[in-house]
Amino acid sequence: MYKKIISSELDAALKILKNFLKNEEQIENIEKAAILIAKSFKNKNKVISCGNGGSHCDAVHFSEELTGLYREKRPGYAAIPISDVGHISAIGNDFGYDQIFSRYIESIGLPNDVLLAISTSGNSINIINAIQTAHRKKMKVIVLTGNDGGQVKHLSDVEICIPYHGYSDRIQEMHIKIIHILILIIEKEMKKIN
């Protein structure tokens, strides 16, 4: 009954993946991002992740794979998603939703920590504020974006952008794949010291 839809959806995802694979700069940026995060862990720093909606779920998933395990047993790594409901509702109420991430980073971010900011559009004001706060705190910034990268494109140390101008779910599908690759490379880098 829905086989055509299923095939069409999988085919569309495959086309985006194949196009991304042709972009050598973005492939290099994935490697740079993973090495940057591993270097932070090696130096006893942490990675803080944030995003809105589905990107928020990706930020949480990224952190839980690092504090727990991905494919192999190993020590947990210092990864914190900005996902505390009490914090989000308090800051949203008292300061505004545009500051829910930046206030958290202001509170716990340290020099040489890493912020992984995830935004399919690259234009979410609370993500932009988080990035600006991270820079003030002398943190490194990695962004996972889509479309043309939006406003965050020029605010990051490393940008990984899915150049797709359609529904955001296609971008999110690529983001979760990239997140898993980042974790795989981080684990390999961390093995060099363990």
UniProtKB/Swiss-Prot annotation:
It catalyses: 2 D-sedoheptulose 7-phosphate = D-glycero-alpha-D-manno-heptose 7-phosphate + D-glycero-beta-D-manno-heptose 7-phosphate. It comes from Buchnera aphidicola subsp. Schizaphis graminum (strain Sg). It is found in: Cytoplasm. Residues 37-194 form the SIS domain. One of its GO terms (molecular function) is carbohydrate derivative binding. This is Phosphoheptose isomerase. The reaction produces a racemic mixture of D-glycero-alpha-D-manno-heptose 7-phosphate and D-glycero-beta-D-manno-heptose 7-phosphate. PROSITE patterns: SIS. The lineage of its organism: Bacteria, Pseudomonadati, Pseudomonadota, Gammaproteobacteria, Enterobacterales.
